[in-house]
């Protein structure tokens, strides 16, 4: 029997397989429920480190919105509730900024976005306080919107520098809020990043 012992010519430029050769298997943990999310954000009141998935952050934001609405509408019937609502809003600023920082970390972004937003928020509050200080409590005691508008117009005209700083800070803050809002809608980055392990993909 004749055997074919001829050598086969080498084949060059063979197509190489595309894509990663190893795909790690990851699974998403169940979405955090509202109660657990709120408890987690309060437990991490001053925690600006680590990561937070979307369900943790947005359930907490919904909790803040509902609580603020209750106090705002309740203040129409019982005026003291408005002051309680303002106090609660101030107390919730820190955990809200902390949760937002962890949410940005979860998408692989820096928390400096939140730091700049917080600074602009403080600038707006201080500027507003300087503008309305000459009117004392008159601006808040009157229920006439026309009178309030006239007071604010006089305040802006009497101190144009502070008014300009407040307006510029408010506009820049609004732009940053839109940007960070989009960031917080993004899904978690699977695997560990420089801020810690993924809270969603294990």
Task: List each language-model region with its residue ranges.
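Juxtamembrane non-transmembrane "cap" segments at the membrane-aqueous interface
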Residues: 132-150
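Membrane-interface segments at the starts/ends of alpha-helical transmembrane spans
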Residues: 150-166
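Membrane-interface extramembranous regions at the lipid-water interface
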Residues: 2-3, 9-67, 92-113, 181-202
